[in-house]
Amino acid sequence: MKLTKLLLASTALTLAAGSAFAEVEMANEMTIVSWGGAYSNSQQQAYHNPYMEKTGVTIINDESSAEAVSKLRAMNEAGNITWDVVDVVAADALRLCDEGLAMEIDADEMLAPAPDGTPASEDFGDLLVGDCFIPQIVYSTTVGYRTDMVGDTPPTSICALFDTEGYPGKRALEKRPINNMEWALLCDGVAKDDVYDVLETDEGQQQALDKLATIKDDVIWWSAGADTPQLLADGEIVMGSTYNGRLFSVIEEQKQPVGMLWDAQVFDLDGWIIPAGLPEDRLARALDYVYFATDTQRLADQSKWISYGPARASSAPLVSTHAELGIEMAPHMPTDPENAKNTFLYNYEFWADYRDDIDAKFQAWLAQ
């Protein structure tokens, strides 16, 4: 695209100066897609509000990130892309990039360097897992439990999910195969390093589903990130999976009788993509926004509102206290050494390759 080549040559200069592109008038309105809840609020506080104040642009929020792949496919087919910047997990970014639905990003040309001049590609390092993906945060999917429903022996292992005798009551699991299949295999005796080798086979997929079948009657399946925290707060489940930031909110902000299980927490990345095929004025605005929102200070600022680790190395030393609670945030991050003693590393490439097929099999199993 002609504009993209132009931006590659001029973005660092024009954006660092905070000026608009001389060649392209930027759109004065943009739609940013995210997940809702505490996470979207953290983005609103750290990114959107300061950017709107700085530029005067209007930001429209859309909470459709869970459906980003299917909706962008439909928009592309219809020839009508209505989103400007989209927050997605890394695996979805890889799929969208492979399908030509997200534009490629040159980190060192399109993103801000660290304050000491370190290029963005080095500052983000290994978290730049795809050509179209701009990392924001490291988060984890883990398990929360009611402290008043587990007796004198709170769970310490992820396999408590499958121990309905020791921990009777309903569980909440996400209505998709990701994480559930991995945990099922781990708790069925598969070594951590072998999980994805097993899961790529039909036999391994069936093994995971068979393990999940042992608790299927006790599971409430969730689709929205707010579901498990609400079910925990209402005492409708004894434990359930959700994002660590959601559990932080329930535990520290709402002061509910909830504990967090860090064992086998699944590390994942979340970040931005820019849809391919945007008109030039909207593309210029989208690039201006992500340059602003992913600099060192902005990523650190997000951690004042939610317990997700910033994706830039230069942001980590700037993580301080919660903006409202005043508590130190570092110990609540999934990347804290005490919390990361037994993590499970999510395989982005595996799920980018196998997601559609395993998803179909999982949904068919749910319907049985």
Residue positions per predicted region:
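Early extracytoplasmic/lumenal segment of secretory-pathway proteins
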Residues: 23-95
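A ligand-binding cleft/hinge motif common to bilobed small-molecule-binding domains
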Residues: 93-95, 241-257
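Gram-negative bacterial Sec-dependent N-terminal signal peptides
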Residues: 1-22
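Mature extracytoplasmic/periplasmic domains
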Residues: 275-342
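A bilobed periplasmic-binding-protein/Venus flytrap-type ligand-binding module shared by bacterial periplasmic
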Residues: 142-149, 185-186, 269-282, 301-304
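Conserved C-terminal helix/tail region of periplasmic/extracytoplasmic solute-binding proteins
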Residues: 335-368
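Periplasmic-binding protein-like
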Residues: 205-215, 253-276, 324-325
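Extracytoplasmic ligand-binding site segments that recognize negatively charged/polar headgroups
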Residues: 37-44, 82-83, 87-227
